[in-house]
């Protein structure tokens, strides 16, 4: 297998009339998804060239998934740009991408124009509702497929950058195919599953949802972001759609607990709960396990740069609040190891010794799009391998081996944090906060116990104005919780 579209094409044959994807407004079968994606790909070839980025400016949904697949048929790669982001953030991402075309919906067009984008804008529905067609479209798509290989990019997801400029992580076909193959096998995801998607499509947790469904013929149910303000709506959607598999951010699971969602109703068909993004509080974990004593619970770890996750731990015992949850063991075909301050290897027979988590293997990202300097810093040659050049990713995360031989997360090497499932550079928050008109100087730290970003600043005492100005430049999850 060389192209993730082979997942879609195989499922369109084996499960043609089965629901492939569903949101709160519409659904589509695997046949419809494949047909509309090919039609979209043919149209997109008129607007851009292969191996170029196409920005998708919309919230997640069936339309979004069709657009993603259409972009891949055109031989390009996609980037989801969240329309709720501040205009400044949108400008930064589009400036890095330098895309020829943005696919959006009419409702988001004004926001896109406000960002200053002056390239081609296409309304998503016209990509497959245009009935004119072209007689040579299939030939053109076939020629494109022959030119694309497994190291060409599929998507570019943006993460926080220490300079205040986001970094676009570029992931290729081979990395996804390698990871998803092991992921679905280990956790027994099959065509019988219904995957309840929580994560936004610019967040790599969603990659597991999308491609696990496409590979196995499972049904993907996309829960709108707005539903999470009303936990009963989330729980009802899980229950009514008979969701079996939840691959969620820790913050979302905790939110549903805090809002007493499971006290209202326990979705009856859930049997797999996989979580990642930050450390799962044992208290919150045990609440979920009390409602689902027979379900599989899995702790996943890994940054965006290694294609979703590099380690996993299937919970096989009870945990008290004094226990530490293991990050676990490496996925097959990924080598996860620790390096000390002098680049010496810290092995499993040195329990308790902390080192930086490093990763080697097929799942490594291609690098940061249009950012060779950041790429060279994070993706380096393995200092332990002197016989030939081996690329590794230095995560900046610290860990140690326990007496049980498992890895345990031990914090960050730098000023990067995980908050609400997102990887954030505190330096970027400080940079934006210091740029607020009434702030002279600022610094931030992350209160891990309360999972809150705390800011100290010199300036005028007007928290409301500070928050309003920051929201114009960064997503809400990057605005400090305490001033």
Predicted feature residues:
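AMP-dependent adenylate-forming
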Residues: 3-5, 87, 102-115, 119-146, ...
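ATP-dependent adenylate-forming carboxylate-activation enzymes
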Residues: 58-62, 76-94, 106-109, 218-240, ...
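Hydrophobic alpha-helical segments in the ANL/AMP-binding
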Residues: 8-10, 62-81, 183-184, 206-218, ...
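Conserved AMP-binding
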Residues: 58-61, 82, 189, 199-203, ...
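Gly/Ser/Thr-rich phosphate-binding loop
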Residues: 215-218, 243-247, 257-326, 332-335
């Amino acid at each position: 297998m060389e192209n993730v579209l082979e997942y879609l094409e195989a499922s369109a044959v084996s499960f043609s009339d089965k629901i492939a994807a569903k949101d709160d407004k519409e659904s589509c079968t695997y046949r419809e998804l494949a047909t509309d994606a090919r039609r979209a790909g043919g149209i997109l070839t008129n607007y851009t060239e292969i191996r170029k980025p196409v920005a998708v400016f919309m919230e997640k949904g069936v339309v979004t998934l069709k657009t993603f697949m259409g972009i891949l048929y055109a031989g390009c790669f996609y980037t989801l740009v969240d329309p709720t982001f501040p205009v400044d953030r949108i400008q930064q991402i589009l400036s890095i991408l330098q895309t020829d075309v943005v696919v959006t919906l009419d409702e988001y067009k004004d926001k896109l124009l406000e960002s200053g984008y002056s390239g081609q804008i296409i309304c998503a529905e016209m990509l497959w509702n245009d009935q004119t067609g072209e007689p040579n479209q299939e030939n053109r798509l076939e020629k494109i497929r022959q030119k694309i290989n497994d190291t060409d990019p599929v998507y570019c997801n943006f993460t926080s950058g220490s300079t205040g400029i986001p970094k676009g992580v570029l992931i290729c076909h081979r990395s996804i195919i390698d990871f998803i193959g092991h992921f679905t096998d280990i956790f027994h995801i099959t065509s019988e599953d219904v995957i309840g998607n929580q994560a936004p499509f610019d967040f790599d947790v969603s990659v597991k949802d999308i491609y696990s469904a496409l590979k196995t013929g499972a049904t993907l149910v996309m829960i709108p972001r707005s539903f999470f303000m009303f936990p009963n709506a989330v729980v009802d959607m899980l229950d009514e759609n008979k969701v079996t598999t939840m691959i969620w951010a820790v913050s979302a699971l905790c939110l549903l607990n805090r809002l007493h969602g499971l006290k209202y109703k326990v979705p009856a068909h859930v049997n797999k709960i996989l979580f990642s993004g930050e450390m799962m509080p044992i208290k919150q974990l045990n609440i979920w396990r009390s409602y689902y004593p027979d379900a599989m619970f899995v702790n996943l770890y890994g940054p965006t740069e290694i294609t979703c996750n590099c380690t996993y731990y299937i919970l096989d015992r009870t945990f008290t609040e004094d226990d530490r949850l293991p990050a676990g063991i490496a996925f097959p075909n990924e080598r996860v190891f620790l390096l000390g301050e002098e680049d010496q290897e810290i092995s499993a027979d040195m329990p308790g010794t902390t080192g930086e988590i490093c990763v080697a293997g097929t799942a490594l990202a291609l690098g940061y799009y249009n950012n060779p300097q950041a790429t060279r810093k994070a993706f380096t040659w393995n200092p332990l391998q002197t016989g030939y050049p081996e690329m590794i990713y230095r995560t900046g995360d610290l860990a140690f081996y326990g007496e049980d031989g498992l890895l345990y997360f031990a914090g960050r090497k730098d000023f990067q944090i995980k908050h609400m499932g997102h990887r954030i550079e505190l330096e970027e928050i400080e940079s934006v906060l210091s740029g607020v008109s009434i702030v002279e100087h600022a610094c931030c730290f992350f209160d891990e116990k309360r999972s809150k970003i705390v800011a100290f600043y010199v300036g005028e005492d007007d928290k409301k104005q500070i928050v309003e100005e920051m929201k114009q430049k960064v997503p809400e999850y990057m605005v400090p919780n305490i001033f």
